[in-house]
Regions:
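Non-cytoplasmic
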Residues: 69, 146-184
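Membrane-helix interface segments
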Residues: 36-44, 72, 88, 118, ...
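C-terminal transmembrane helix and the adjacent membrane-cytosol boundary/short C-terminal tail
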Residues: 40, 102, 109-120, 124-128, ...
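Transmembrane alpha-helix signature in integral membrane proteins
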Residues: 4-33, 97
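Membrane-interfacial helix termini and adjacent extracytoplasmic/periplasmic loops
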Residues: 60-97, 167-171
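Transmembrane alpha-helices
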Residues: 20, 103-108, 112, 116, ...
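Interhelical loop and adjacent transmembrane-helix boundary motif
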Residues: 1-6, 167-206, 210
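Cytoplasmic-entry segments and transmembrane alpha-helices of multi-pass inner-membrane transporters
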Residues: 32-63, 120
Length: 222
């Protein structure tokens, strides 16, 4: 039996890019949520948490409409000469960012909220500029939150199925990630190949969560 590594590499590529994009996007959102008292805060919290409770097919359906040739993002992509978004890796990436957004925002929100305001005020009295305070004081204090956000968003992307199937379909080398490849093997009654993929994903998920809890436990004891 020859093992097809293409879905593995594609999944790792998708998860890595999703994680990086989410850290960039979720950081300002989480910081604003942790400090703002604006009336729209509850609305933003609801929207960023919504993917947690929505069935993946519902989210995938509306993303498919948005990314389709007649949707706003799909039309914009075509006008910019970037090509279609549905059934492409770019579409998968956008869908993964939406789907895994809560797994980045929530840990960062909790980490930012736990920072003692007196430490930030102390940095202000030393005439540190806002960006200097953020990078030299806030980010180091929120490091466990950043680690949790990175690990959870990466691991969640690895296990995606419904959203990626609806947006990307099942194109080998382009959109066929691990979960889709495993589904293919099960449909073809190729249980040995499906077992290798499922077992690998199980070991990966357990290892990631164990390492995360171990790190967070050590951090809280310090």
């Amino acid at each position: 039996m020859t093992f097809d590594w293409q879905p593995v590499f594609l999944t790792l590529k998708l998860a890595s890019l999703t994680m990086i994009c989410l850290l960039v996007i979720a950081t300002p959102i989480a910081w604003w949520l942790s400090r703002s008292q604006h009336w729209s805060k509850r609305l933003v919290e609801t929207l960023t948490t919504l993917p947690l409770i929505l069935p993946p097919t519902v989210l995938g359906f509306y993303l498919l409409i948005m990314l389709g040739p007649n949707g706003p993002l799909g039309t914009l992509s075509e006008q910019l000469g970037l090509g279609p978004l549905v059934f492409s890796f770019s579409g998968l990436l956008i869908g993964s960012i939406f789907y895994s957004l809560p797994f980045a925002v929530q840990p960062l929100h909790n980490a930012f909220s736990a920072i003692d305001k007196q430490l930030i005020e102390a940095a202000s009295t030393l005439r540190a500029k806002p960006l200097d305070r953020f990078f030299s004081v806030i980010i180091p204090l929120a490091r466990p939150g950043f680690l949790s956000a990175a690990v959870l968003s990466f691991a969640h992307t690895v296990g995606e199925f419904g959203v990626v199937l609806m947006i990307g379909g099942n194109i080998p080398g382009e959109t066929q990630v691990l979960s889709i490849a495993m589904y293919d093997h099960v449909e073809a009654l190729e249980y040995q190949q499906a077992h290798w993929l499922a077992g690998g994903m199980l070991v990966f998920a357990f290892s990631v969560l164990y390492a995360l809890y171990h790190f967070n436990h050590r951090s809280t004891r310090r």
